[in-house]
Every structure is written in structure tokens, then in C-alpha cells.
A protein has these predicted regions:
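N-terminal small-domain helix-loop-helix segment of the aminotransferase-like
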Residues: 2-102, 109, 284-287, 389-391
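Helix C-cap/helix->beta junction micro-motif
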Residues: 27-30, 138, 198-199, 313, ...
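PLP-dependent enzyme catalytic core of the Aspartate aminotransferase-like
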Residues: 81, 333, 342-352, 357-391
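Conserved PLP-anchoring active-site segment centered on the Schiff-base-forming lysine
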Residues: 113-135
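A short helix->loop->beta-strand "cap" motif at the edges of active sites that frequently abuts
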Residues: 119, 140, 198-201, 229-230
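Active-site phosphate-binding strand-loop segment of PLP-dependent enzymes
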Residues: 143, 148-216
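Conserved core segment of the aminotransferase class I/II
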Residues: 225, 229-300, 304, 308, ...
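Conserved glycine-rich beta-strand-loop-beta hairpin in the small C-terminal domain of fold type I
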Residues: 282, 298-307, 317-329, 361
Length: 391
């Protein structure tokens, strides 16, 4: 008997990621030293304090039973203290915070917990792939909200059709943005909350990159906006802020009803995050509150080095104000996929085609600053040398 996957699987994700992996494998098999600037996985280790906390916690026999699906009260209390410290936002650890196995866990399951098949949700294009994939899994109709350079990659909310705004259960946005590296100011979030209240719409904000901002810019939480908890939830992750991507720990905050819906779903799916990892998460948040631990300066230097080197080669890219990514407009005459493939085959550098994140991403590539400065300079040199051969 031949076993095949469900029809849903054929609608999931982009084949582009698989293509890029195949290209990389082929080039590496030829003995090429490939510099991978594709996947946004931090290359830095957690702080010594976090590693010490993990080491101590894994030696504690009490941490090897099933954890609670909503996360330990101690971790949720630490999140509440950190939100107060970082954003000036008060949260109830009991009803307004839910621990997650990484933000992707929550993002993948949110539509299942809030929507019924046939409902609609608004997601950005370009956007992080799980945003649309989660709707496919839940049988929810997506409305793709275009984010374009002429509007600084901010949505034009008034352009959303009235019937879409009326039908949609939620609108999902992400600032600072992956893949766009775009940012949004307080005025935008105030307008977004007003819009959501007008249309009885839940706002889902993905704030994974709040601690990775440059040039003095400090991203805000949407929950800072007056009345936001009536209509908004916010995802946050320890993956990028504290170099804990492999630990799989994050949290959802905000509207108690939405938090409880996801909590109810997850209580039927999993037993939550390993207790030792939650202990390390507490240590990470406490260290940040005590010493303002930040990785932003590392990525700011990498951004400066890489963009300057590419500029010398004639590829001018606007410097992003946040995230570990560069959303780079490509030279004329190429598609995103063509230039990504040729860059790998001729320069040995992996980047992700912009259309991997939606049709609106055509004309761009995403570059992840996940190599040390010397490797980034080498990547820029290789790209520049290759581009000069095309002149």
C-alpha cells in the first residue's frame, strides 16, 4: 500500500526552501566552502549565566516530570516582571501569559484555537511562512495583506475590503519584521488598535525581534497602547534575544480570552516546555533586567560591515533598523530565485529568495547576518567579485 500525505500538505509552505537546500547540497558536494546566510539561526551561544542555569536545572530530579502545559508559574511571573521592566506593561501571570515551545508552536496553533473552518484571517505578504501555513492547517481562508516598499512595508489598513475586515477573526503583523527588517512606530500601533476595535478584530503581533534593534531605536510592545489588551495578543521569544533558539521557549501575552483559547488547545496536545529550560528562561530574563543583556550591538556591527562591503561592490542596500536580516532589493534583470541560485553557484553564498515569503517578496532576497564579521566580509567580497563579472 502506498501511503501519501494529506491534501493539506500540498498547500503548506514554499518549495523554494527545499530548492535552496538542494542547491546548497549540490554545491557543497563539489567541495565549495559555502557561506550560509539563509536560515536565521543565531550563531552565538547563550550567556554564561544561562548556561549555568541550564546545567544546574538538568541536575535537579524534580525537573524530569511532566511540566504543566501553560508553563510554570515562576516562569510566567518572570515574564510579567520583564514586561513591566522592558515595556511598562502590567500582565497577570495567571491569565495573560502562556508559555510556548518557541513562538512557532503558538503561531502554528493559534488559528486552530480561535477559528473554525471557513473563517478568515489577515496575514502579511511577505510574511514569515508559518503565518499562512497555520491557516491552511486550520482550514481558514487567508487574506494576504501586501507590504510594499513605497509604504515602508507597513500595511495600508484602509485598503482592506470592508467585507474582509468584517469576516476576519484576526490580523497578524510582525514588527520588527522577519523577513522585511521593517519597523513600526507608536502612531502606527495606535492606528492599528483603533482599526481593530472598529472592526471587532483581534490583533496578533509577533515581537520576536524587540531586543535586536540598532542606532538607538527601541521597539515597543503593542500592549503599551491604551486599551490594547482588549483586542491584542503578542508573541515573544527567547530564541533571538538570548541565543536560545534550540531551547524552544517563548510566550504569548495579552488578551486573556485569546490566551486561554490557545492554552486550552495546547493542554490537549502537549505537556509544555521542559522545566529545566523554563528555569534557564527565568535566568535569561532576570539577567536582562539586572544587566541589560543584549545581542543587538553584535548584529549592528555585522550589518554595518556587510552593507559597507557590498556598497563598495556597487550593491547599495538600505541599512535596516532592526532584526538579524537584510531585506535586499536585487539588481534589475533578475528574479529573486535566479539571483539566489546564481549567487550560490558562482559565489558560494546562500541567501533566501524573497518570494519564499510570498508573491510580494519578488524583487528581493533575505540575507541573515548569522556569521562572524570575517565570514560576512568574505561573503560580500565573493558576491562583489561575481557581480563584477556580469558587468
Amino acid at each position: 500500500m502506498k501511503i501519501t500525505g494529506s491534501k493539506r500538505l500540498s498547500q503548506l509552505g514554499s518549495a523554494i526552501f527545499s530548492e535552496v537546500a538542494d542547491w546548497k547540497r549540490e554545491v557543497m558536494n563539489q567541495g565549495v566552502d559555502v557561506i550560509d546566510l539563509g536560515i536565521g539561526s543565531p550563531d552565538l551561544p547563550p550567556s554564561d549565566r544561562i548556561i549555568e542555569a541550564i546545567t544546574e536545572a538538568v541536575r535537579n530530579p524534580a525537573h524530569y516530570g511532566y511540566p504543566t502545559s501553560e508553563g510554570s508559574l515562576a516562569f510566567r511571573e518572570a515574564v510579567a516582571r520583564w514586561y513591566r521592566y522592558r515595556f511598562g506593561v502590567e500582565l497577570s501571570p495567571e491569565s495573560e501569559i502562556l508559555t510556548l515551545m518557541g513562538s512557532q508552536d503558538g503561531l502554528a496553533h493559534l488559528a486552530l484555537s480561535l477559528c473554525d473552518p471557513g473563517d478568515m484571517a489577515i496575514v502579511p505578504d511577505p510574511g514569515y511562512p508559518i503565518y499562512s501555513a497555520s491557516l491552511v492547517l486550520a482550514g481558514v481562508e487567508p487574506y494576504l495583506l501586501p507590504l510594499r516598499a513605497e509604504h515602508n512595508f507597513l500595511p495600508q489598513l484602509e485598503d482592506i475590503p470592508v467585507d474582509v475586515a468584517a469576516k476576519a477573526k484576526f490580523i497578524l503583523l510582525n514588527y520588527p519584521s522577519n523577513p522585511l527588517s521593517a519597523v513600526a512606530d507608536r502612531a502606527f500601533f495606535e492606528h492599528l488598535i483603533t482599526y481593530a476595535k472598529k472592526h471587532d478584530l483581534l490583533v496578533v503581533h509577533d515581537l520576536a525581534y524587540s531586543e535586536m534593534a540598532f542606532d538607538g531605536y527601541r521597539p515597543i510592545s503593542i500592549l503599551e497602547i491604551e486599551g490594547a489588551k482588549e483586542v491584542a495578543v503578542e508573541f515573544h521569544s527567547l530564541s533571538k534575544s538570548f541565543n536560545m533558539a534550540g531551547c524552544r521557549i517563548a510566550f504569548l501575552t495579552g488578551n486573556a480570552g485569546a490566551v486561554n483559547a490557545l492554552k486550552t488547545l495546547k493542554s490537549n496536545i502537549d505537556y509544555g516546555v521542559f522545566s529545566a529550560i523554563q528555569a534557564a528562561g527565568i535566568a535569561a530574563l532576570e539577567e536582562d533586567m539586572a544587566h541589560n543583556h543584549s545581542v543587538a550591538h553584535v548584529y549592528e556591527r555585522r550589518r554595518n560591515v556587510f552593507i559597507s562591503a557590498l556598497a563598495e561592490a556597487g550593491w547599495i542596500i538600505p541599512p535596516p533598523k532592526a532584526t538579524m536580516f537584510i531585506w535586499a532589493p536585487i539588481p534589475k534583470g533578475w528574479t529573486s530565485r535566479q539571483i539566489s541560485r546564481e549567487m550560490l553557484y558562482h559565489a558560494g553564498v546562500v541567501v533566501i529568495p524573497g518570494d519564499a515569503f510570498g508573491a510580494e517578496g519578488e524583487g528581493f532576497v533575505r540575507i541573515a547576518l548569522v556569521q562572524e564579521e570575517g565570514r560576512l566580509l568574505e561573503a560580500a567580497k565573493r558576491i562583489g567579485d561575481w557581480l563584477r563579472t556580469l558587468e
